[in-house]
């Protein structure tokens, strides 16, 4: 799962947290003017994409809070600071912030999922962290019966790590690990999450098992085709429709492949990738 997509999920969770307003209004009412000013400035900078400046503002707000314990408004500031650090690509700093948050609420699955994502990104770049740390955090979140979009994204991030390692080292054991983790995700979601099915379909195509890939594609499309889609769901459907055409092409069923790509073009328009596929297929069908 890519940085922007995960960050949007985190940002949405934070906004919903404040929309509830149960504790936020009380705590904001008791904070200092300097603390409030820096907190609001940090949120504005975060929304503008000025992540480093946002972190500085949140640090000033925490300093103004003046408490030696992690509680109250300071937790909310830390949540925003952690997001800003993550979106800035400062994963080590984000890890520190989420570990602080976990020390205040060790059972909050959101923090575990973000640590799973961060540990995945730090694997192979930090000698003290490896993919097993990410899986441990993911499993802890799963034990909280976590079925959130963020949890799904954490699992996909781990699976994609294994696929990236395969691409770098061409060691099939990485593909085995990716498949094992994706099957775990399919089981957790009861094969009812289109995003997981889309990633699984691409993986099975890489393994040249096009029948299993098509099965996942058909399941994923069936989950989405009759509902009003969010932006994320529409991107997933787009991926599934392209995968359908690719699978039929690899199976040498060129007529079905062309039909699938034409359906893709009808819905999403023509781009360079699909134009190349269509040209190839038309040449073959002749």
Positions of predicted regions on the chain:
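N-terminal leader/linker segments that initiate helical-solenoid repeat arrays
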Residues: 30-80, 87
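Canonical tetratricopeptide repeat
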Residues: 73-76, 80, 114, 153-157, ...
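Residues that mark the junctions of alpha-helical repeat units in TPR/alpha-solenoid scaffolds
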Residues: 34, 74, 108, 115, ...
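Flexible helix-coil transition and linker loops at the boundaries of alpha-helical arrays
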Residues: 63-75, 103-111, 141-151, 184-191, ...
């Amino acid at each position: 799962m890519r940085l922007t997509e995960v960050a949007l999920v985190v940002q949405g969770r934070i906004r919903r947290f404040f929309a509830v307003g149960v504790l936020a209004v009380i705590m904001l009412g008791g904070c200092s003017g300097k603390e409030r000013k820096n907190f609001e400035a940090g949120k504005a900078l975060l929304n503008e994409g000025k992540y480093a400046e946002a972190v500085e503002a949140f640090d000033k707000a925490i300093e103004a809070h003046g408490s030696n314990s992690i509680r109250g408004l300071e937790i909310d500031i830390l949540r925003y600071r952690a997001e800003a650090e993550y979106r800035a690509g400062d994963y080590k700093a984000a890890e520190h912030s989420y570990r602080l948050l976990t020390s205040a609420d060790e059972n909050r699955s959101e923090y575990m999922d973000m640590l799973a994502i961060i540990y995945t990104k730090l694997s192979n770049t930090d000698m003290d962290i490896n993919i097993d740390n990410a899986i441990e955090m993911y499993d802890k979140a799963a034990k909280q019966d976590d079925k959130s979009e963020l949890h799904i994204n954490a699992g996909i991030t781990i699976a994609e790590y294994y696929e990236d390692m395969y691409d770098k080292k061409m060691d099939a054991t990485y593909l085995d690990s990716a498949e094992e983790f994706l099957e775990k995700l399919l089981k957790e979601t009861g094969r009812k999450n289109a995003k997981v099915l889309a990633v699984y379909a691409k993986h099975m195509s890489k393994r040249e098992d096009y029948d299993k890939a098509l099965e996942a594609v058909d399941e994923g499309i069936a989950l989405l085709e009759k509902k009003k889609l969010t932006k994320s769901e529409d991107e997933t459907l787009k991926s599934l429709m392209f995968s359908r055409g690719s699978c039929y092409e690899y199976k040498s069923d060129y007529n079905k492949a062309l039909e699938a790509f034409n359906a893709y073009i009808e819905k999403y328009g023509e781009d360079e990738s699909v134009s190349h596929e269509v040209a190839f297929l038309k040449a073959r069908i002749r």
